[in-house]
Amino acid sequence: MEPLWHKLSALPFFSSRPEKWEGSGAPPSLTAFIRSLFKGKALSLELYATALTHRSMVHDTTAPEITRSNQRLEFLGDSVLGLIISEYLYRRFPEGTEGELSSYRAKIVNGKSLAGFARNLDLGIHLIIGESADQQRIRTSTSTLADAFEALTGAIYLDRGLDAVREFIEEQIIDSPAFEAMVSTENNHKSRLIEHTQSHQLPPPVYTVLSEEGAEHEKTFTIEVSCNGRRLGRGTALRKKDAEQLAAEEAMGALERALTGDVAEDTPAPEETGRG
């Protein structure tokens, strides 16, 4: 059976897609786009072409040989994405209740959020859509983009395995600026610590990595936070951001105790912290 990739490449519309889409500029080669996700490593183009094939292609009379869309990969990717995000939240919030973790996950794994991550990748311009379909509407549709992101996740899992798809999710979701807003709210101890130091006219907190232990893919980071040269707290976690949050949480606890008179040893009150 001829690979889907070859079939798509031979279609007239595939080589003559519009040169630009609203706000996206000229789309690069689909092959180059896929390879760019993994720093040029060899990939199964067949699998990724399927992940980016919209269901309208299956019904396109100009391409009767195309019988598969990305819907099955979307189904798989939804589960893989849910697993990786659930595992991350479980580790990041060891005291979080089932309800709290579910609430965080719902903010991350939903159509609107996933469509935003898809837009960051310019996924819309790479979708393979039926010639008779409303291409511009489909390429910018929230549900279509979310589905494509899930399908891409499923393709990465089948092609590269769990570690590779976890790395992809970390880069595209967990390390994105929008992610912290989804899981932080009142638990953003770093923001609380900054607000506290500013209100007492102190220098901003400084985070220092004290140690990195373990294998490359399972490192544990210990980070210390200080202000004006005085240690305020430290935290240990599998990710630097999480260790910083734990250090800031400990620092806030110490500072709050200092303000109420319950001062722990080696933890000065804010006024004392600012002295030379």
From Swiss-Prot:
Protein's name in the database: Ribonuclease 3
Coiled coil: none
Keywords: Cytoplasm, Endonuclease, Hydrolase, Magnesium, Metal-binding, mRNA processing, Nuclease, RNA-binding, rRNA processing, rRNA-binding, tRNA processing
Segment forming the signal sequence: none
Localization, UniProt: Cytoplasm
EC numbers: 3.1.26.3
Reaction catalyzed: Endonucleolytic cleavage to 5'-phosphomonoester
HAMAP family: RNase_III
One GO term describing the cellular component: cytoplasm
Cofactor(s) required for function per UniProt: Mg(2+)
InterPro entries, per the entry: dsRBD_dom, RNase_III, RNase_III_dom, RNase_III_sf
Claim: Cell division is one of the keywords in the record: no
